[in-house]
């Protein structure tokens, strides 16, 4: 949804993506947009608006199915690389205290429901965001205002 809104619909960024990293007891859910510095505040506003919409309205079944397919595809491709397989197995042991089989991971992905996505979104997407800005920005007050207002202008 972020890619569609920021890159495809508005043409404001060169690259837009989301990523997640899980660790024992904590993690990171991040969003990245590489854009012209003159558009960066607008891009942050749009990210906040999209995240707020996900919290309020959830994702469609189609969006969730697309995301599941992307995660499954990425996981399957990662199995071709020995280093990726070792990393997945080690991370599983450290984070979950057990090694989850490839099939169990695929089954877990398949079980994700719209209600679960919305619950996680409500818990994590708009509370206490942290923003890293790289570029020629001397005055960060506009960014701080966007974060305080949750994307609403």
Protein language model regions, located:
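A short, acidic, amphipathic alpha-helical segment used as a generic capping/interface helix at domain edges
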Residues: 112-120
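Proteolytic maturation boundary segments
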Residues: 126-153
């Amino acid at each position: 949804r972020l890619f569609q809104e920021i890159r495809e619909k508005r043409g404001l960024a060169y690259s837009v993506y989301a990523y997640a990293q899980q660790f024992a007891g904590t993690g990171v859910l991040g969003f990245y947009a590489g854009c012209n510095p003159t558009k960066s505040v607008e891009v942050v506003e749009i990210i906040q608006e999209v995240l707020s919409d996900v919290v309020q309205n959830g994702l469609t079944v189609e969006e969730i199915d697309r995301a599941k397919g992307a995660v499954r595809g990425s996981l399957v491709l990662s199995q071709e690389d020995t280093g990726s397989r070792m990393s997945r197995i080690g991370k599983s042991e450290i984070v979950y205290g057990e090694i989850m089989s490839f099939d169990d991971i695929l089954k877990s992905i398949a079980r994700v429901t719209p209600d679960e996505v919305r619950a996680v979104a409500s818990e994590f997407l708009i509370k206490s965001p942290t923003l890293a800005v790289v570029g020629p920005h001397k005055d960060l007050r506009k960014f701080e205002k966007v974060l305080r207002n949750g994307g609403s202008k």
